[in-house]
Amino acid sequence: MGNENLRPWERQDGETEKAFSAFKAYLEMEDRNVTSLAKRLSKSRQLLVNWKQKYNWQERCIAWDKSLQEIEYKTAV
């Protein structure tokens, strides 16, 4: 199964369980701050920065936010 079949906020091909777990925690953060996440998860900031870049967290968060906005719009109309 290739990434093209996955929604961006789902675990991606090659993404470790630990990296995906950190991504989910990042996705749920109000301010989405890697330094705060590192403290919360007791992980090194550099590790999280590497995962953020390697697994495209920023783009995936944008897709997630857009999906939520579409759902909110559809339920409001």
Regions picked out by a protein language model, each given a short descriptive name:
Residues 1-77:
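N-terminal, charge-rich alpha-helical recognition modules
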